[in-house]
Amino acid sequence: YVAEVAEETIEEAPIPYTLVEEKPSFNGGDANEFTKWVFSNMVYPEVARENGISGRVTLQFTIEADGSLTNIKVLRGVDPSLDQEAIRVVSMSPKWTPGRQRDKAVRVTYNFPIYFQLRN
């Protein structure tokens, strides 16, 4: 009787790139296209509006090789209501065209500022 022990291999996802030969794109455009999409889907939180809270929320997320967004987190927040709205909107994003390195789709880390500004 011989017992065999199979070595278990855990395949870890490759670390996302920050610089790539071909940047990810949104709807065939650049970051400005994504900014337009974010603002068309954003709802200014009532509590922030009532308290006159505005500012810039900086998010970081990973654009996966399949174009989906993951690991969405706040790098620099303003107020929990604005931070949560920024995460909510970005998490609804349609798929991107992924970044490419050596002609292969790769994961890319992306930092994205969202400006919340009250208008009178």
Could you say what each language-model-derived stretch is?
Residues E21-F26, I72-K73:
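Second-shell loop/turn segments in exported
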Residues S25-Q60, E85-N120:
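Short proline/glycine- and basic residue-enriched helix-capping loop/turn segments at helix->loop/beta transitions
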Residues Y1-Y17:
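A sequence-level signature for low-complexity, intrinsically disordered linkers and tails enriched
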Residues R76-L82:
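A short acidic/small-residue loop/turn micro-motif
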Residues L75-R76, F112:
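A generic structural motif
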